[in-house]
């Protein structure tokens, strides 16, 4: 099994801790709302909601925040309607970006993202302009102390996942599968005694655009961070990777 996610290098370079910025709570709240909206407020009947709740608990999200997000998603609490939408754009050297946002105003989000792209050397695209360069996959994350790479691979095979790699910390593991098998893989991971802290669909670049120039790498990273910092952003995907020798200069 080979690593599916070129972002492991990018995350290493960025070394960004969203929790310190208070963004993790907000992202889990959005995910819980969207999960409850699409599949109902009972986590026993809604695998996506269950994973979102477990993930929120793993980062110590207050119980009342979780309950409020569920009620907003099911409509029990009033307020603006949140919807999930994907925007597309181009970065330095024609690199491709997808940004999934949770928003109550698509026109506002489009305008704000257009500004972010422009300020950081990119341009927002039209629907379908770069999406064809990505493939949809299912992703499940668990926290498991003491799991080695070999045992993680064995677990992936047992649970029917296509791939596995280490996540953002030593104890986090990311399992990748086809979208249609995501629920089954999550169920198998839980059956094996693991808590799934995140399950979602992701976009994986079919071909990486390798950056071999220091200034271009800096520009691409600035754009990625600007998009990732956007308040309504849920996920940011891109097809760029950074060459090892450039990565060392950035380190």
Curated annotation (Swiss-Prot):
Primary localisation category: cytoplasm
Entry keyword set: Cytoplasm, DNA-binding, Transcription, Transcription regulation
Keyword Cytoplasm attached: yes
GO MF term (any one): DNA binding
GO cellular component: cytosol
GO BP annotations listed: regulation of DNA-templated transcription
Superkingdom, natural source: Bacteria
Localization in the cell: Cytoplasm
Metal-binding keyword on record: no
Family in the record: Belongs to the TACO1 family.
Protein name: Probable transcriptional regulatory protein Amuc_0709
Phylogenetic lineage: Bacteria, Pseudomonadati, Verrucomicrobiota, Verrucomicrobiia, Verrucomicrobiales
């Amino acid at each position: 099994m080979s690593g599916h996610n070129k972002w492991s290098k990018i995350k290493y370079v960025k070394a960004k801790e969203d929790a310190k910025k208070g963004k993790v709570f907000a992202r889990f709240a959005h995910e819980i709302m969207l999960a409850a909206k699409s599949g109902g407020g009972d986590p026993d009947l809604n695998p996506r909601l269950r994973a979102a709740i477990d993930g929120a608990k793993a980062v110590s999200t207050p119980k009342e925040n979780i309950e409020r997000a569920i009620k907003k998603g099911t409509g029990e609490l009033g307020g603006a309607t949140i919807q999930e939408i994907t925007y597309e754009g181009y970065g330095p050297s024609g690199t491709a970006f997808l940004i999934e946002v949770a928003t109550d105003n698509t026109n506002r989000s489009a305008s704000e993202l257009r500004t972010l792209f422009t300020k950081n050397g990119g341009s927002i695209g039209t629907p379908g302009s770069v999406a064809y360069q990505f493939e949809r996959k299912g992703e499940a994350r668990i926290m498991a102390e003491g799991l080695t790479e070999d045992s993680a691979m064995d677990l992936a095979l047992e649970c029917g996942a296509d791939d596995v790699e280490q996540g953002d910390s030593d104890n986090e593991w990311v399992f990748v599968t086809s979208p249609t098998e995501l629920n089954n893989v999550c169920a198998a991971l839980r059956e094996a005694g693991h808590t799934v802290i995140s399950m979602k669909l992701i976009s994986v670049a079919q071909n990486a655009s390798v950056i071999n120039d220091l200034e271009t790498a800096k520009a691409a990273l600035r754009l990625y961070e600007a998009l990732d910092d956007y308040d309504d952003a849920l996920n940011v995907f891109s097809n760029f990777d950074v060459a090892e020798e450039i990565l060392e200069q950035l380190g």
